[in-house]
Amino acid sequence: MSAGDGLPPLREVVARHGLEPKKALGQNFLYDLNLTGRIARAAGPLAGVTVVEVGPGPGGLTRALLAEGAARVVAIERDPRALPALAEIAAHYPGRLEVVDADALAFDPRPLVGDAPARIVANLPYNVGTALLTGWLDGEAWPPWWDQAVLMFQREVAERIVAGPEERADYGRLGVLCGWRTEAEILFDVSPSAFVPPPKVTSSVVRLVPRAQPLPCRAGALEAVTRAAFGQRRKMLRQSLKALTPAAGDLLAAAGLSETARAEEIPVAGFVDLANRWDAHRKAGAPVGTPA
């Protein structure tokens, strides 16, 4: 397939630079520039926007983002084999592509983004996608540095991101954290045949838009409560929350929740209430029923 941006076809780039995907890095490359273009367009108009991309590999999505008009792309890549291929793209789009040789799990892109409008668009490596997302949702400061994220995950992870109590099998800590701070939706699925090598499962592209004003809650408190609650999801909350406090029953009563309730039955607002009450309870002298 010839590319419409004047750069060589991706298969040729991969062959020339010896970029066969590595399973250890969670790499599955997209060669179809029509598909990468669709992903880039899902992030909306990109004029004037800085896009942060994780795991660009040979640069198929990178090229699509630049072709769709992104003012600047910050591409974070830990595989040194990909750097020469990305350098070729940077030369083709002078001043618009900054390649960072780093592990995205340990790298903070905010100093490079600055005050410019920013989005995250990425075909995330399967082995670190969830960890990256929870990191972007973390922190007490909100709204975050990004105004939208368009991300590729395994379908089962995507379903967990958008799940609520009505989808009990998929609903968990990830769904609570995403539902608390973002509006999340699955945009479309991507067949395994679109990737090289083809994974064993279908993938999905998810869009997350930060809520301007999430329900007030300390992020660390919500993380602690959901970790305890879903860590033993089949147990009643009065048992699973004892990992946090011996007063779990009083905490549930103060929140108006049944002691026999299980984590998968509690909506996001219920977990926020629990987290606020637990946060108050852990402060010296604060009664269980007092919100933080």
Swiss-Prot record:
Main location, first listed in the record: cytoplasm
Keywords on record: Cytoplasm, Methyltransferase, RNA-binding, rRNA processing, S-adenosyl-L-methionine, Transferase
Keyword Protease set for record: no
GO cellular component annotations of the record: cytosol
GO function term, MF aspect, one: 16S rRNA (adenine(1518)-N(6)/adenine(1519)-N(6))-dimethyltransferase activity
Keyword NADP tagged: no
Catalytic reactions of this protein: adenosine(1518)/adenosine(1519) in 16S rRNA + 4 S-adenosyl-L-methionine = N(6)-dimethyladenosine(1518)/N(6)-dimethyladenosine(1519) in 16S rRNA + 4 S-adenosyl-L-homocysteine + 4 H(+)
PROSITE patterns assigned: RRNA_A_DIMETH, SAM_RNA_A_N6_MT
Catalytic EC class: transferase
InterPro entries: KsgA/Erm (IPR001737), rRNA_Ade_diMease-like_C (IPR023165), rRNA_Ade_Mease_Trfase_CS (IPR020596), rRNA_Ade_methylase_Trfase_N (IPR020598), rRNA_adenine_dimethylase (IPR011530), SAM-dependent_MTases_sf (IPR029063)
Segments crossing the lipid bilayer: none
Binding locations of S-adenosyl-L-methionine: 28, 30, 55, 77, 103, 123
Compartments reported by the entry: Cytoplasm
EC number(s) given by UniProt: 2.1.1.182
Family stated for the protein in its record: Belongs to the class I-like SAM-binding methyltransferase superfamily. rRNA adenine N(6)-methyltransferase family. RsmA subfamily.
Function per UniProt: Specifically dimethylates two adjacent adenosines (A1518 and A1519) in the loop of a conserved hairpin near the 3'-end of 16S rRNA in the 30S particle. May play a critical role in biogenesis of 30S subunits.
Name the record gives this protein: Ribosomal RNA small subunit methyltransferase A
